[in-house]
Amino acid sequence: AFMTWNTDAKKPEPPAEGLTVDVFIPTYNEDLAILEATLIGCNNMRYPHVTYVLDDGRRREVEELADMLGCRYLTRPDNVHAKAGNINEALKKTSGEFIAVMDADMVPQPDFLEKTLGYFWDPKTAIVQLPQEFYNTDSMQHADGGAHWHEQQLFYHVIQPGKNNINAPFWCGSPSVVRRAALESVGGVATESITEDFLTSIKLNSNGWNIKYHHEVLAFGIA
């Protein structure tokens, strides 16, 4: 109760100019129409960036879609360590100072980067995590609340903002922005656990890095 007494947080300053930003969209077997909406949304974010499709499905049609939309296509010969391994492999092939991570169904708003990169004025900020929200209301996530709420809202709108007050929010993967240097300093995304984002959070905090929570919905996915 004490942790969640005040969930208001100071909004960051506008971001510095000239930051280099990569956008990672890990995918495996998602429908092309879903992936297309995400790529278009990522391309429409206003801060300069490069969008990468990380395709563990190694699909020709995904490569063609990425090429058509002006995105870069990356793949690898195996699927070792699943999503964590996919992101770690992409780290080796890219160079942006900051990385926005979007699930294949997560469509960001145009101001996503403008509202999150400002947190990185603090040199100890490793990750900015945002709430997960969904544009469909017919899923199991909405079984009890219908169109009014889904089962993760307590976590994303009460617990995470409260943990932000004590400098202890979790990285939840998507949607988020990551400082490359911080992630590389702990060996990339953790591969020793199926909850790789949570374990990576612990490693970052243990090494003096901070995670920030931006309590505003700036991306929508499918539940």
Identify the meaning behind each predicted range.
Residues 215-223:
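Active-site donor/metal-binding and catalytic loop motifs
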Residues 19-22, 50, 184, 199:
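Cell-envelope/extracellular polymer assembly enzymes that use nucleotide-activated donors
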Residues 23-39, 57:
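Active-site beta-to-alpha loop of glycosyltransferases that engages the nucleotide-sugar donor
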Residues 55-62, 78-79:
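A conserved acidic beta->alpha catalytic loop
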